[in-house]
Design a protein with these regions (language model features):
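Short alpha-helix boundary/capping elements
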Residues: 50-56, 88-89
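C-terminal structural segments of small proteins and small subunits
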Residues: 78-101
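Mid-chain, well-packed structural core segment of small domains
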Residues: 58-81
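Residues at the start of alpha-helices and the adjacent loop-to-helix junctions
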Residues: 41-42, 59, 72, 88, ...
């Protein structure tokens, strides 16, 4: 059996649980992310904070890139991670810092 190399957890989930992915695609993005009560920038910052707080580092690179695309600066993300350290713990913040550094270093090198 050949090994499939997925570039993201979402891609792997799409292959294994297509109905879950369809639900996310039909609900999360059209209904939640498009609600005008919060800007995409604010939603991205909230999402990054939630992922860090919950320890879901596997989704963090994609959402860090999305946050940058939605106008959150690297300095703002660094400040948010530092702020979170005092509320959700230093290990999670340190892991998030390392992931952010790798994510943005990779982006700058491409």
């Amino acid at each position: 059996m050949s090994r499939i190399n997925f570039s993201s957890p979402r891609e792997a989930a799409r292959a294994f649980t297509p109905k879950l992915s369809q639900f996310v695609d039909s609900t999360l993005y059209p209904l939640i992310w498009s609600d005008p009560a919060l800007s995409p920038r604010d939603r991205s910052l909230i999402t990054v904070a939630a992922l860090i707080a919950a320890g879901h580092s596997e989704e963090l690179p994609a959402h860090l890139r999305r946050a940058a695309g939605n106008g959150v600066t690297q300095d703002e993300l660094a400040a948010a991670i530092t702020h979170l350290a005092f509320y959700v713990g230093f290990p999670g913040a340190i892991t998030a810092s390392a992931i952010a550094n790798a994510t943005f270093s990779e982006t700058e090198n491409n």
